[in-house]
């Protein structure tokens, strides 16, 4: 098999892996916000799908109805994670350009 000069597929894969690893680090710094219950519960999630904060308005804290608060927290967190995944996929897509390279997996991305 003859390879043309200047084309080294392994070098290109390594460069792509390096770019994606840098992007993963950048995603840790990017955040999305999500809320439920008209803003009564709000969460901040980073691009690595890590929940950074949860805020609960005092008005929604009812000792007689804990289930409602739990449902609002779950809804806000799930919405935040979905938004974070969409953001991460969009950012990574800029680098990968839709490539599907076997073995090129970035932990915590998908």
Curated annotation (Swiss-Prot):
Main localization of the protein described in the UniProt heading: cytoplasm
UniProt key word DNA-binding: yes
UniProt keywords (A-Z) are:
Cytoplasm, DNA-binding
Q: Where in the cell is it found?
A: Cytoplasm, Nucleoid
InterPro entries registered for this protein in UniProt: YbaB-like_sf, YbaB/EbfC
Q: Which family does it belong to?
A: Belongs to the YbaB/EbfC family.
Subunit architecture:
Homodimer.
Name by which UniProt lists this protein: Nucleoid-associated protein Sfum_2790
Q: What is the scientific name of the source organism?
A: Syntrophobacter fumaroxidans (strain DSM 10017 / MPOB)
